[in-house]
Amino acid sequence: MSADRPLIAIAIMAAISLAACGKPATDGETADSGGVQPAASPPLTDAQKAALQAELPEPYRSADLEKGEALYAMCRSCHTLVEGGASMTGPNLWGTFGAKAAYVTGFNYSDALKTSGLTWDFATMDKWIEKPRELVPGTKMSYVGMKSPEDRAALIAFLKVNTTPAK
């Protein structure tokens, strides 16, 4: 038992050291934002997601949301989806549909995207995900694109359902 005491002491000191590394975020504040963020909406229920998807045009209405979620795993390293979420390498995607390109305040977009005049509708999002550098030459987005129309439809349906407030 006495051999365990040094390990326990080291574990406690490590936990205390890690706890002191950063200031925890307070209510409505994110640690990396430097300020207050809007309160996020509660996650959508499966029924709310199904209702949102039922309102989408084809091929998004019949797209596989689970497949879209799996495809989003590629996007997750650069983008967040939740309301009030942080921008990372790429901007937060909450509220994308219907917004003008380069709409996230404070995100460092390329001049090409800022001046593109694009609005994020289904057709534009499809072209963007297929070949972003072809749609907007000079974009900073390093993603090479997604060839499969079925995969793009699944991803776009997932993004639309998960970046739109519940009704």
Positions of the model-derived regions?
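Sec-dependent bacterial lipoprotein signal peptides
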Residues: 1-19
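Bacterial signal peptide processing site
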Residues: 21-25
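Electrostatic cytochrome c docking/interface patches
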Residues: 38-71
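N-terminal post-signal-peptidase region of extra-cytosolic proteins
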Residues: 56-61, 76-80, 107-114
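Stable alpha-helical elements in mature extracytoplasmic
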Residues: 64, 71-74, 89, 121-124, ...
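Gly/Gly-Pro-rich "capping" loops immediately C-terminal to redox-active cysteine motifs
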Residues: 65-69, 83-119, 143
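The canonical Cys-X-X-Cys-His
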Residues: 68, 72-81, 155-159
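C-terminal capping alpha-helices of c-type cytochrome domains
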Residues: 121-167
